[in-house]
């Protein structure tokens, strides 16, 4: 227990600790008549948004050092209130309390093994679902805290002894999460979890550089592919529901289209020095989906939006027979745009390297829940062959070194 002035000093000292939780935003596809349309934006109150919030919060808790919860003495009228202590939480502590208020049973009922694939959720679930002996008997801590304490605006209405028990349980849960999150076993898991995405990132960037060696002017197409929510839920769509085997066939058909058919629909030379990469992911809200990059000859392809739409139409109408949805990123507006027309010396090439490529190849907690261990989730094309004779002015060393340096710094 600390006094009010000491708590203010502690609170002032934790402003340097990161407490920002990014709002959960997602891309979903829904049926509208006989068409599949996309919507992108904030999506609160879902299982996916709750798990995302818990994950971000636990990442910050693992990195934090200070105590998050305290009791401070206050002057009260004991005839009106049964206590002389008041509950205080730091900013990160408030984020932790929001996690405690979430319905974890809703998550684990639908995804019983979620904690295995997302250890941040697993460590939180284990830490707050411990049994605690209260006055009326033994109960799960998170259940009592959520249903009988945090649901009320006044957190101090309990007797001092009960408030002290809540604070002790919360701080012990935080310490348990910190111990696990900073253990050698967890660090080994994290290193292994990030290894393949890091390799995929380097593979994709090397592919882009190889395409730049063939064409000094690129047209970068970016689009996301998925399925209408109706077909993602077997309870709604029954035998029409999307399965892992169907997704594999759709991905193979997309790859064949990009390798063999796309060039037949574009102007001659558009696919000279072409490259592409497909990344498969699984979301708790939208289930199976893909992030795709296609690299074309920028001197020939001027309308990147329409070419991207051609591929998206093929996915929607032919490959998935109307079950699939597509989002044309080239049509959207971005504050930092690393797609579309890109030349070797463009600032957009840096954005492509530092923003677009890492996003496409980012780690995915949940793909392991639905695919066999030996199956891949990233499919890059082979790099284009570099011709012995190259046209155009000779690139200076400073230009070449600039790209190599930025690549090395991003590792």
Task: Mark where each language-model region is.
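Long, contiguous juxta-domain segments that are non-catalytic but functionally important
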Residues: 136-213
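A short, flexible beta-alpha/helix-coil linker loop
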Residues: 228-232, 295-300
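Extended repeat-based interaction scaffolds and adjacent low-complexity, acidic/S/T/P-biased segments
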Residues: 1-169
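Signature for HUH/AEP ssDNA processing cores
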Residues: 206-278
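Catalytic "initiation/cleavage/transfer" segments centered on a nucleophilic residue
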Residues: 2-11, 15, 27-87, 190-214, ...
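N-terminal catalytic cores of peptidoglycan-degrading enzymes
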Residues: 129, 133-135, 145, 159, ...
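A short acidic (Asp/Glu
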Residues: 234, 287-291, 304
């Amino acid at each position: 227990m600390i006094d009010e002035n000491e708590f203010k000093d502690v609170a002032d000292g934790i402003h340097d600790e990161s407490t920002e939780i990014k709002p959960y935003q997602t891309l979903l596809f829904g049926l509208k008549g006989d068409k599949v349309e996309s919507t992108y934006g904030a999506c609160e109150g879902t299982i996916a948004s709750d798990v995302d919030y818990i994950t971000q919060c636990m990442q910050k808790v693992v990195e934090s050092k200070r105590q998050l919860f305290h009791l401070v003495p206050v002057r009260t009228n004991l005839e009106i209130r049964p206590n002389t202590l008041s509950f205080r939480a730091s900013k990160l502590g408030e984020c932790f309390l929001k996690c405690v208020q979430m319905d974890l049973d809703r998550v684990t009922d639908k995804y019983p093994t979620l904690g295995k694939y997302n250890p941040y959720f697993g460590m939180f679930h284990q830490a707050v679902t411990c049994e605690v002996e209260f006055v009326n008997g033994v109960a799960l801590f998170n259940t009592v805290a959520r249903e009988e304490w945090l649901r009320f605006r006044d957190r101090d209405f309990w007797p001092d002894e009960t408030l002290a028990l809540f604070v002790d349980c919360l701080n012990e849960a935080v310490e348990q999460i910190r111990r696990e999150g900073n253990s050698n076993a967890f660090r080994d898991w994290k290193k292994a979890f990030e290894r393949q995405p890091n390799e995929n990132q380097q593979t994709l960037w090397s592919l882009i550089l190889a395409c730049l060696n063939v064409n000094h002017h690129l047209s970068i197409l970016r689009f996301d592919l998925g399925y209408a929510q109706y077909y993602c839920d077997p309870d709604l769509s029954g035998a029409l529901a999307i399965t892992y085997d169907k997704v594999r066939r759709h991905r193979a058909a997309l790859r064949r289209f990009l390798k063999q058919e796309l060039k037949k629909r574009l102007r001659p030379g558009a696919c000279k020095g072409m490259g592409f990469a497909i990344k498969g992911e699984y979301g708790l809200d939208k289930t199976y989906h893909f992030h795709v990059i296609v690299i074309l000859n920028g001197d020939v392809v001027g309308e990147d939006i329409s070419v991207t739409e051609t591929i998206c139409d093929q996915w929607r109408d032919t490959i998935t027979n109307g079950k699939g949805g597509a989002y044309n990123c080239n049509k959207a507006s971005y504050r930092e745009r690393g797609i579309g027309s890109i030349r070797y010396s463009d600032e957009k090439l840096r954005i492509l390297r530092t923003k677009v490529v890492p996003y496409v190849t980012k780690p995915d907690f949940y793909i392991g829940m639905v695919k066999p261990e030996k199956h891949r989730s990233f499919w890059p094309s082979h790099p284009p062959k570099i011709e012995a004779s190259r046209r155009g002015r000779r690139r200076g060393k400073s230009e070449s070194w600039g790209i190599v340096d930025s690549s090395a710094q991003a590792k």
